[in-house]
Amino acid sequence: EQGEMTNRDLLELAAKAIGMDVDFFGDENGFDCVTDEQQYWNPLTDDGDALRLSVQLHIDILHRFCGGARVEALAPGGRVIAEYCHVDTRGDATRTAIVRAAAEIGKAVK
């Protein structure tokens, strides 16, 4: 079984899910990605990029507080395809859940 995906892996698959090519640059401490239209894109850190990604892929977001706070990302039809627990970083958790869900969708893209 494969280990945890890196942020770069998640972003590559999320971009694939929406048919976008991205290039990465930076170092081990951080990186940026640029779309084929030369625009910065990182839905893990940018609320607008994350919202556009969820809209394009019809991902619904639920905030739950059962046994701890968590964010769930749902595919069309209501199936949970990603969830991310958080303490007090709801924005980060929401963006991460969206990107994880998009990455799951991207895995199915040929």
Task: Cite the ranges covered by each PLM segment.
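Glycine-rich anion-binding surface patch
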Residues: 1-110
